[in-house]
Amino acid sequence: MLDAFAKVVAQADARGEFLSNTQLDALSKMVSEGNKRLDVVNRITSNASAIVTNAARALFSEQPQLIQPGGNAYTNRRMAACLRDMEIILRYVSYAIIAGDSSILDDRCLNGLRETYQALGVPGASVAVGIEKMKDSAIAIANDPSGITTGDCSALMAEVGTYFDRAATAVQ
């Protein structure tokens, strides 16, 4: 966001002009949208443990074979690895939300994840279901209108959903 401000100021300075009303309005909108992003990321971060835990609980309720002997999340070590991976994915989704760009999610989290899971025998479809459950929970928490920046957040919530969808697709 600061790069955008610096760019506008540099352009005006190069022309020896004050910032125009149009430029100020665009920067004001950027700040407003940035505040919404901060609110969303703050809510997701503050509720990350509950988002991951509830998603895992729902996943294992729907797919109990995962936590039964021989299942991919059977034993405490495997369960901990599953929860850790879900938390990492949620963390990188939050980075993408704040940046407004999925490249950090792709580059640092998702690239190669499917292949890693396949090599380890982790069922990608089950991981995708867990990610979908995190998505539903995170959007419900982030979309709660109490105590956040007012305004229409439907476009931002749709964007948030796309980051989770990207992660779910990447592991299948």
Curated annotation (Swiss-Prot):
Residue positions binding (2R,3E)-phycocyanobilin 2: N72, R77, C82, L83, R84, D85, M86, E87, I88
GO biological process: one example: photosynthesis
Function: Light-harvesting photosynthetic tetrapyrrole chromophore-protein from the phycobiliprotein complex (phycobilisome, PBS). Phycocyanin is the major phycobiliprotein in the PBS rod.
Membrane topology annotation: Peripheral membrane protein
Matches recorded under SUPFAM superfamilies: Globin-like (SSF46458)
Keyword Transport: yes
Other facts noted in the record for this chain: The light-harvesting antenna system in red algae and cyanobacteria is formed of phycobilisomes. These are composed of the phycobiliproteins phycoerythrin (CPE), phycocyanin (CPC) and allophycocyanin (APC). Cyanobacteria also contain phycoerythrocyanin (PCC). The phycobiliproteins all share the same subunit composition and organization with variations in the covalently bound open-chain tetrapyrrole chromophores. Although originally identified as Cyanidium caldarium, these sequences derive from Galdieria sulphuraria.
Official protein name in the record: C-phycocyanin beta chain
Modifications made to the protein after synthesis: Contains two covalently linked phycocyanobilin chromophores.
Subcellular localization: Plastid, Chloroplast thylakoid membrane
Self-association and partners: Heterodimer of an alpha and a beta subunit. Dimers further assemble into trimers and the trimers into hexamers. The basic functional unit of phycobiliproteins is a ring-shaped hexamer formed from two back-to-back trimers contacting via the alpha chain subunits. The trimers are composed of alpha/beta subunit heterodimers arranged around a three-fold axis of symmetry. The phycoerythrins also contain a gamma subunit which is located in the center of the hexamer.
Coarse class of the protein's main subcellular location: plastid
UniProt keyword annotations, A-Z: Antenna complex, Bile pigment, Chloroplast, Chromophore, Electron transport, Membrane, Methylation, Photosynthesis, Phycobilisome, Plastid, Thylakoid, Transport
A Pfam family this chain is assigned to: Phycobilisome
PTM-bearing positions, type N4-methylasparagine: N72
Gene Ontology cellular component terms for the protein in this record: chloroplast thylakoid membrane; phycobilisome
Family of the protein in this entry: Belongs to the phycobiliprotein family.
Binding-site list for (2R,3E)-phycocyanobilin 1: N35, D39, T149, T150, G151, C153
